[in-house]
Regions:
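A short Gly-Trp-Pro
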Residues: 1-16, 21-142
């Protein structure tokens, strides 16, 4: 998920699914750390996590096209486009008042410095506190 090492400047970035039905905008700082999670769903989908506070996420269109999938604890709300099947964002259990946006689904301007770090999602409960300090400034929840 994403942490902010120290950048002040905020940028508005567009994102969405492959077919274009789901579109959103996010506001992010100039420096971000994105996590590559090793849990089963992230590993199989190639998801790169960027946690964005709900106040910095704006769904422009496609909400009616989203299909929700929950597993294990049932807390995380995985949202897939019902047309193309892409998960461009979802509501993570670590930050239920935020969104995890897939870096691969965002148009990132050249001014953004992106660092990708590994996260041991196979042992999520043991490592979840390492996700604290995201763009939301919140701590993780179960």
């Amino acid at each position: 998920m994403a942490t902010v090492p120290g950048g002040d400047s905020m940028f508005t970035c567009s994102g969405g699914c492959h077919c274009g039905r789901v579109k959103f905008e996010i506001e992010i700082p100039s420096e971000i750390i994105v996590h590559r999670c090793s849990c089963s769903i992230c590993r199989k989908s190639g998801y790169l996590h960027l946690i964005v506070a709900a106040s910095r996420f704006n769904l422009l269109c496609g909400g009616e096209d989203l299909i929700e999938y929950r597993f294990h604890t049932g807390v995380a709300r995985h949202l897939f486009c019902g047309v193309c099947g892409i998960k461009s964002y979802y509501v993570p259990r670590s930050h239920p008042d935020s969104f995890s946006v897939n870096l691969n689904c965002i148009d990132i301007p050249g001014e953004i410095d992106v660092t990708i770090e590994a996260f041991d999602g196979r042992n999520w409960s043991k490592n979840r506190d390492k996700l604290a300090g995201s763009l939301t400034g919140e701590t993780c929840s179960d």
